[in-house]
Regions:
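Short, compositionally biased
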Residues: 70-83, 130-132
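Short Gly/Pro-enriched turn/cap motifs at secondary-structure boundaries
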Residues: 22, 96-98, 142
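Catalytic nucleophile loop of clan PA
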Residues: 97-118
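C-terminal cap/linker of serine protease catalytic domains
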Residues: 18, 41, 62-70, 114-174
Length: 174
């Protein structure tokens, strides 16, 4: 989405903002963006090794704003596979419903930790190839790969991952 761009428009709960493209990783379909207009709190990131098959996950995004409007939408699902398409070990397969506008958004565990980044879904091309319409077959790059891209921008103030026993569940924070 950002290939070749030095800046992009980003939808936020406060409206549309401009973001600079700091770094990209085409192999994992990731980019590091810096929003203009202030400082924003960092989100806690959980290591990929903590994720389990069947674990509840969610994303927040601005899908299909022309139809669904500009308010953020939360969708929940599960980790359907510990590997992505074609058993790609860099990604999770998720049952979280995603639409255009969710791509690039954080995938959260039930404690509000970022565990991945939503990158793709099976859609019409898969339906043409298989004769069946995929339902909630979506993918997120694991947090380990996102952290590698973010490493130059992290500092000591980055929050530690929330612990299961001491932190509220994701649905209590939304």
């Amino acid at each position: 989405v950002v290939a070749g761009s030095s800046s992009v428009k980003v939808f936020t709960a406060q409206g549309m903002k401009t973001a600079s493209v700091l770094r990209t990783d085409e192999a994992n379909d990731l980019a590091v963006l810096k929003l203009a207009g202030g400082a924003y709190p960092a989100l806690p990131v959980a290591p990929s090794r903590r994720i389990r098959l069947g674990q509840t996950v969610a994303t927040i995004g601005f899908p299909n704003v022309q139809i669904q409007g500009f308010s953020p939408k939360v969708t929940k699902g599960e980790i359907s596979s510990l590997n992505g398409i074609g058993d790609d070990p860099r990604a999770w397969q998720i049952s979280v419903p995603v639409q255009p506008g969710n791509s690039g958004g954080a995938l959260f565990d039930e404690y509000g930790n970022v565990v991945g980044v939503v990158v793709s879904k099976l859609g019409i091309r898969a339906a043409r190839a298989t004769g069946d319409i995929p339902q909630n077959v979506n993918y997120a790059i694991k947090s380990t790969y996102a952290l590698a891209l973010l490493e130059p921008y992290l500092d000591a103030s980055a929050p530690e991952p929330n612990q299961e026993a001491t932190q509220p569940r994701f649905e209590d924070m939304v």
